[in-house]
Amino acid sequence: MPQADFYILPSADEDSRYQFLGKLATRAISAGHWLYIHTDSEHLAERISERLWQSSPESFLANSLPTEKLHAPILIGWQPDHIPNTPDMLVNLSTIFPSQTVEFSRIAEIVIQSDEILALTRGRFKEYQGAGIQPRMHDMRKRSS
């Protein structure tokens, strides 16, 4: 059964979501995970890719898009057929619950304080429960930066 974690951020802006993604990806890669980040569009995937390559002044997070030949520990896709054949960890930044979600061993949802994102998150939380997955909540609003 997959482990699903919802990270509730204190901010409403997308930038904080991408900053947290960089931290989460760094920890996951250090722990030996291969990440698949699912987005809603190619444009958003490219934007996230750029952010990860420039994640911090002293490091970068190697990643690739399905349209590239590069084999990196982070794959960023936007269509169901982009999901890897050997799924490990999913970071779902899309507005949907991909049907292959239950095939991953770890799942992360990064939630910002936007009305649209919060409404989608409530729906996805129920979808996880419907799939037999009991999500864990991590309220980052209660932690200092």
Which sequence ranges carry the predicted segments?
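Hydrophobic/aromatic beta-strand patches that form the interior of the parallel beta-sheet core
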Residues: Y7, V91, A108, R136-H138
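Conserved RecA-like P-loop NTPase helicase motor core
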Residues: P80, P84-I96, F104-A108, I112-F125
